[in-house]
Amino acid sequence: MSDRASSATTQDFIRSRPAEGALHTPDDRRVVALPAAVMQALHAGLPGESPETLRPVLYRAGYEWGLQEMLHLHTRLRAELDPSDQRDLWHLDAPFVLERWAAPFAAAGWGACVFDLSEHGKRLLFVELRHSAAAAASRDAKVNAPVCHLYAGLFAGALSFYDRTESHAVETECTALGHACCRFIVGPGPLIDRAETARQSGLAHEAIRRLSLDPKPAAPAASAKAAKIPWKK
């Protein structure tokens, strides 16, 4: 289990090249600095997109981004390891891998994560996120549900790469709703379906966590509606 917040300085992961007017990562990928207004506009809605269609767009973008960042990390770690030790990323310690994956996001202002891998044997990951850029962008908006769909996709993509099997994610608490931090549950699709339905029925995070750990199917609350999960076609 990793209960340490991922931490890093901007200088560790973002290098300025004043002569070029550019920012780059240590592995020479270009970085673009965007104002908070861009994030606000993105979550206010894309042209022609309703809130219902915007959610899966953000989730899928995050999912693919999470996969690609894990792929880049895999390449970097192979370069860092001793030539005689060329293990694949998924053979390395999960807390180490996830913290290395999350560190550039924290350095770039996307927030700091705490990863709880105590139930990783059941393919479950619990994430606590502080300083979510998406939640901050929605702070002044009237929202009645979690808004960090991009982050949910990121965490699902990262765990999918590490576990080499598809995982999904749901946000159960969000600072845009007044919670102290944003919380996510990442795991197999059927369990996340249940977690999303439970969230929609009004269950708190800890109750949803217990439900996701219970192998017995639980009857949904009378007021619960079928969950509209972003990754379902």
Question: For each predicted feature, which ranges?
Answer:
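Active-site helix/loop of acyl-thioester processing domains in fatty-acid/polyketide metabolism
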Residues: 146-164
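N-terminal accessory segment detector
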Residues: 1-125, 133-150, 167-181, 185-233
